[in-house]
Structures are given as C-alpha cells and as structure tokens.
C-alpha cells in the first residue's frame, strides 16, 4: 500500500516521518483510492474540497470526512455521488447537524452517514476516567 499525503504546511520530511510520500493537492485527488480528511475548520480550510477537487477523483475512489463538514463543499459532494463520479463517501460531519430527515445523504446508496460520536463507548469512557484518576493521583503524589 502506498500512503500519500498533502497539506498546506507539510514538508517532505514530515511526510516521510509519517510513512507517507508528499504529493500536490491535485495529485492527492487524482491518485488516492481512499481519501481521508483530517483538518480543523478554519478560514483556510472552509470549502477546501470543492467540485474541482472531487471531479479529479477516480470513479473507484472513496472519500472519508470525519473532520468538519464545511471543509468539503456539500453540494459538490452530493453531485459527484449522485452521478456516481466517485464510488462513495463515509461522513459523520455535515453542514447542518443533526442531518435533516430529507437530506440527500440519507438516501444515496453510496453514502455511509453516521453521527459524529462514533468513538463513544462504555470501554472508552472507562479508559478516560481511569486515566484521569491516575493522572490526578500522580500529580498529588508529587505535590
């Protein structure tokens, strides 16, 4: 498997340290089989992925956005999904949350849409609480 990456601030050295090859934004969209988005929402990232980027993707490619909805232009994504220009999308972030009942993402057969709470589980919260208590004890022991 080849891991490619792009970021406005990434250096070739940082990509290599992460086990990836730095490519241009255009190359990322043209080459990726599975494209995952891991960015914070800011004025620089809002609308970063629009129709031009999505239309560069392979028809067999899949997009995963678990960052923030407005990073991907929602109407452009709906368009490429409806037209089967990409194989599918997995998303748990949307322009409007909760996702309205009539939203197209709910009916497209090439969309996996979930709430942005996929990490929530009993085991995870147990770990959070145990780690918190452990950290407090360690701090108290040294002060």
Predicted features by range, described:
Residues 1-2:
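Residues at the starts of beta-strands that form the adenosine-phosphate
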Residues 6:
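The conserved SAM/SAH-binding core of class I Rossmann-like methyltransferase domains
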Residues 9-104:
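Rossmann-like adenosine-cofactor binding region
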Residues 95-143:
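C-terminal helix-to-coil terminal segments
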């Amino acid at each position: 498997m080849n891991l490619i990456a792009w970021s406005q601030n990434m250096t070739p050295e940082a990509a290599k340290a992460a086990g990836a090859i730095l490519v241009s934004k255009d190359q990322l969209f043209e080459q990726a089989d599975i494209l995952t988005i891991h960015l914070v929402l800011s004025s620089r990232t809002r609308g970063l992925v629009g129709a031009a980027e999505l239309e560069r993707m392979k028809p067999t490619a899949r997009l995963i956005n678990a960052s923030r909805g407005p990073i991907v232009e929602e109407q452009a994504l709906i368009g490429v999904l409806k037209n089967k220009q990409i194989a599918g999308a997995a998303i748990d972030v949307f322009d409007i949350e909760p996702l309205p009942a009539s939203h197209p993402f709910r009916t497209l057969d090439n969309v996996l849409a979930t709430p942005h709470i996929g990490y929530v589980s009993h085991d995870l919260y147990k770990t959070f609480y145990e780690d918190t208590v452990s950290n407090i004890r360690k701090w108290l022991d040294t002060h």
